[in-house]
C-alpha cells in the first residue's frame, strides 16, 4: 500500500511542476485535465503526508521513552505514544478508502430517465412522484435540473421523462438510483381501498463529452416529425420533433420538448451520446467484473432496488436491507440517509476486493 501512496505523492509533485509550465498553461484542455487529475489525488496526498508526520512523531516518542525520564515525564510520553498510535490506525483506514479506485464518471453531470412500468396510470403517477423527489433532492444539493423531454399523461404522471442534472458530485450520488422502483399504495381511483403495486424504472447515465464518445454522422439516421401532446394529438404543424437512430447499436432517441428542431436535435444528441457511452462502458465493465458481483447489486435496470410502502410510511432498499420509516421525508427529496448508506456499502465492498487482490 505504501509504495502506491508514495507513487501518488510523486505524481502530485510532478503535476505541480507541470501546472506551472508555460506550455501547459497555454493549452486550456491540458491544463483542465491535469488540474482535474491533481484535484482527484489531493486528499490522498494530504492524508499520506499527515500519516508520515505521525509516524515521525511515534519514532521520536519511542526514542524518548528509551531515555532516562522521571515518572511524570514517562507517563506523559506513554499517553502521547498511545494517542499517536490511535491516530496512525485511523489514518491507515482513511488511506485504504482513499486508495479504492474512483469511478471516472463520478464528477460528471447526469442524464436522468424515468419510465412508468408495470401498473398503468398508477405507474405513470409514481414516475412523476419520483421525478419530483429527485428534483427536490437536486435543489437541496444546489444542482440544476433541466427537463429535456417528457411524455406526460392526462392525470399528472409521466410515461417517460428525461432530464439533465448539472452539479457537483451529481453522478457519484445519483448512480445508485439505477433500477426498478416499486410502490405500494391505494390509488386515488381505488374505491375499495385495496393496495396496488406498481413500478417505475430509473436510468442514471453520466453525461458523455464529445471527446469520450465519437459519433459519426454516417452512423446516425435522423428523422423529423410533428410534435404530439398527451393523447397523441399534434401540438404544432412544423416538423420540429427529432428522432435519432444510432445504426451500429440500434439505440433510438426521440426529442420533442422544444419548438425548435435544432434545439431538439441538440438535446437528442446529448442523450444519444450518453446512452451509447453507457452501453459501451457497461459492456466493458461486465467483461471486467464477470466473476465479481458487487454487494450493492448489479445496477441492472430490471433489478428491483427499492420499495416505497405508503400505508406504512416505509422505504426499503433491498440491496443493503435498509428500512426507513420516513417515506414522507424521502419523497420530499431527503435522500442522503439512503445514498450515504449505499456509498458506504459500495466503498466497503471495493475495499474488501482491493484487500483480496493484494
From Swiss-Prot:
| GO terms, molecular function | translation release factor activity, codon specific
The yes or no answer to whether the keyword RNA-binding is present is no
Which domain of life does the protein's organism represent? Bacteria
Name positions with the PTM N5-methylglutamine: 233
Q: How is it modified after translation?
A: Methylated by PrmC. Methylation increases the termination efficiency of RF1.
This protein's GO cellular component annotations are: cytoplasm
Q: Where in the cell is it found?
A: Cytoplasm
A Pfam family this protein belongs to? Answer: PCRF
What exactly does this protein do?
A: Peptide chain release factor 1 directs the termination of translation in response to the peptide chain termination codons UAG and UAA.
Record-stated family:
Belongs to the prokaryotic/mitochondrial release factor family.
This one is known as Peptide chain release factor 1
- Could you tell me the gene encoding this protein? prfA
Amino acid at each position: 500500500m505504501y509504495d502506491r501512496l508514495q507513487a501518488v505523492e510523486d505524481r502530485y509533485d510532478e503535476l505541480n511542476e507541470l501546472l506551472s509550465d508555460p506550455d501547459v498553461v497555454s493549452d486550456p484542455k491540458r491544463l483542465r485535465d491535469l488540474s482535474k487529475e491533481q484535484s482527484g489525488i489531493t486528499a490522498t496526498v494530504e492524508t499520506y503526508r499527515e500519516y508520515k508526520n505521525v509516524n515521525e512523531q511515534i519514532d521520536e516518542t519511542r526514542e524518548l521513552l528509551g531515555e532516562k525520564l522521571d515518572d511524570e515525564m514517562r507517563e506523559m510520553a506513554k499517553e502521547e505514544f498511545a494517542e499517536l498510535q490511535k491516530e496512525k490506525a485511523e489514518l491507515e483506514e482513511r488511506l485504504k478508502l482513499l486508495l479504492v479506485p474512483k469511478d471516472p464518471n463520478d464528477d460528471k453531470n447526469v442524464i436522468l430517465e424515468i419510465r412508468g412500468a408495470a401498473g398503468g396510470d398508477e405507474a405513470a403517477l409514481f414516475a412523476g412522484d419520483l421525478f419530483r423527489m429527485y428534483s427536490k433532492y437536486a435543489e437541496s444539493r444546489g444542482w440544476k435540473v433541466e427537463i429535456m423531454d417528457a411524455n406526460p399523461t392526462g392525470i399528472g404522471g409521466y410515461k417517460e421523462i428525461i432530464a439533465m442534472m448539472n452539479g457537483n458530485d451529481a453522478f457519484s450520488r445519483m448512480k445508485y438510483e439505477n433500477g426498478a422502483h416499486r410502490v405500494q399504495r391505494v390509488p386515488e381511483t381505488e374505491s375499495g381501498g385495496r393496495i396496488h403495486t406498481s413500478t417505475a424504472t430509473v436510468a442514471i447515465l453520466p453525461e458523455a463529452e464529445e471527446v469520450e464518445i465519437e459519433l459519426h454522422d454516417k452512423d446516425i439516421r435522423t428523422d423529423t416529425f410533428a410534435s404530439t401532446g398527451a393523447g397523441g394529438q399534434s401540438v404544432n404543424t412544423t416538423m420540429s420533433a427529432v428522432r435519432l437512430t444510432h445504426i451500429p447499436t440500434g439505440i433510438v432517441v426521440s426529442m420533442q420538448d422544444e419548438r425548435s428542431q435544432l434545439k431538439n436535435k441538440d438535446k437528442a444528441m446529448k442523450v444519444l451520446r450518453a446512452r451509447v457511452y453507457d452501453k459501451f462502458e457497461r459492456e466493458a465493465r461486465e467483461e471486467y467484473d464477470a466473476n465479481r458481483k458487487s454487494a450493492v447489486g448489479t445496477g441492472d435496470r430490471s433489478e428491483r432496488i427499492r420499495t416505497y410502502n405508503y400505508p406504512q410510511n416505509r422505504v426499503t432498499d433491498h440491496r443493503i436491507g435498509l428500512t426507513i420509516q420516513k417515506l414522507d421525508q424521502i419523497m420530499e427529496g431527503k435522500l442522503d440517509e439512503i445514498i450515504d448508506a449505499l456509498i458506504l456499502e459500495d466503498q466497503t465492498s471495493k475495499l474488501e476486493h482491493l484487500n483480496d487482490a493484494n
